[in-house]
Amino acid sequence: MKKLTEKITQFIENFKNVHAEARKIGFAGIMNLLWKDLFVGRSLFQWLYLIVLSSVPLILEFTQNTESHDWMSLFASWTGIVCVILVAEGRASNYLFGAINSAIYLVLAMNATFYGEVLTTVYFFVMQPIGLYAWLSNRINDQGKAEESHFEAKKLSVLDWLKYLALTAIIWIGMGLAYQSIHSVRPFRDSVTDATNGVGQLLMTRLYREQWIFWIATNLFSIYLWWGENIHIQGMYWVYTLNSLVGWYQWTKAVRKEA
């Protein structure tokens, strides 16, 4: 109970700090921070990486021999790719693109009757402001290190690994049983991404490097899930997989730098 009280007190204090900082710099200051987070401090290679990968949805759309364009899927794919690249770079602006992507992807998943993806996307949408708060709180409350890095990556201990793997199994089985109760055709298949996405988002919010392992698992399974359904979403998850490998590498370097 004492630890819970301390965490609640810390949450309230951090929220006050974030709110006070936002009021101090004003709307113009917030926009300036957003601009810097999006565009400042990126190397030439990172710019090329961002431009090339975010062009994949456009290439897929305009090289297909179709009479009409699937603009919703294209925009969902584009915002998703930009989001995960910003995550790999440790930029808080990823949550803006994540919120937009989640809203569009929710509609696509509902249309495809992928109920597991629907629930996961609702969870993602809710987690975006929470994640943004966590990242901003981390920066504001430790401003001495803010100039050195966009974020302070951490790594899981053996005990943490066991805890999060157990949580993954619980979510997978629990959601599988829930889908089974509503007569889903493939209940435990649908619940796979609920588990990997849910734990991955938790690790991302807490700035753990191992989030990328869960993202890789999610991406590979999602490619299988969307195979033959939507070329844009397939392409998005292939890019996600590549970016997850890059993200693992970048966050591993950040962990070693903080050690």
Each model region followed by its residue ranges:
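Polytopic alpha-helical membrane-helix bundles and their juxtamembrane interface segments
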Residues: 24-88, 125-128, 135-259
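Hydrophobic/aromatic-rich structural module bridging two neighboring secondary-structure elements via a short loop
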Residues: 92-134
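Short, Lys/Arg-rich, polar N-terminal cytosolic tail immediately upstream
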Residues: 1-40
